[in-house]
Design a protein with these regions (language model features):
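Active-site region of glycoside hydrolase catalytic domains
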Residues: 2-178
Length: 178
C-alpha cells in the first residue's frame, strides 16, 4: 500500500470480489443470513488494519454476480433457482450495510466507502412506444435498481416486491434490514 501511495497510485480495496471462503459456502454461503453479519466483522478487521493508509474501500464488487451464481449457475456456487438468487441478493445487500456500518464505526476521516454496481441501463427501442418504455423500466427494476433502490431509498421498488411475491422468490426481509 505504501509503495502504491509513493507512486501516486490511489489504492481502492475491495472487501468482496466473488471470493467467498469455502467454509462459509459450506454453511450456506450467501443463502445464510449470518454471512452478512460475519462480513461486517471481517470489515471491522480490515478497517482497523488498513484504514489509516487506504483512502477508498468498496464493500462488494458487482453483486449481480452473486445473483447469477445462485439463480443461473453461471458463477459459483452454480445453483439454478431464482428464489436462491433473490435471497443471496438480499443477504449481500445486508453485508454491504454491515460493511458500511463497520466503516462508520471506525471513524476513518480520510477514507471513503462504496459498492460497485453494474449499471447497464436499458433504454426503450422506441421511446414513444408505451410498451417499449414499460419493458425498459421493468428490466431496470430487475437489474441495477434492485441494488440501488435498497441502498439509496431504503426499500425495494413496489414492482420488484410484487414480482417476487407473485413468483414465490421473496427473500426474508426483517425490520431494520434496510
Amino acid at each position: 500500500i505504501d509503495e502504491l501511495l509513493k507512486s501516486d497510485i490511489v489504492p481502492n480495496m475491495t472487501l468482496y470480489h466473488w471470493d467467498l471462503p469455502y467454509e462459509l459456502q459450506n454453511l450456506g454461503g450467501w443463502l445464510n443470513r449470518d454471512v452478512a453479519k460475519w462480513f461486517g466483522e471481517y470489515a471491522e478487521i480490515i478497517f482497523r488494519e488498513f484504514g489509516d493508509t487506504v483512502p477508498l474501500f468498496a464493500t462488494i464488487n458487482e453483486p449481480i454476480a452473486t445473483y447469477v451464481g445462485y439463480a443461473c449457475g453461471a458463477f459459483a456456487p452454480g445453483l439454478k433457482l431464482d428464489r436462491f438468487g433473490k435471497t443471496a441478493n438480499h443477504n449481500i445487500l445486508l453485508a454491504h450495510g454491515e460493511g458500511v456500518s463497520a466503516f462508520r464505526a471506525a471513524n476513518l476521516k480520510n477514507s471513503g466507502i462504496g459498492i460497485v454496481v453494474d449499471i447497464w441501463k436499458r433504454h426503450p427501442a422506441r421511446p414513444d412506444n408505451e410498451e417499449d418504455v414499460s419493458i425498459a423500466r421493468r428490466e431496470n427494476e430487475e437489474s441495477y435498481l434492485s441494488y440501488l433502490n435498497p441502498i439509496f431509498k431504503g426499500r425495494y421498488s413496489d414492482y420488484l416486491l410484487a414480482k417476487m411475491e407473485r413468483e414465490g422468490t421473496m427473500p426474508e426481509i426483517r425490520d431494520g434490514d434496510m
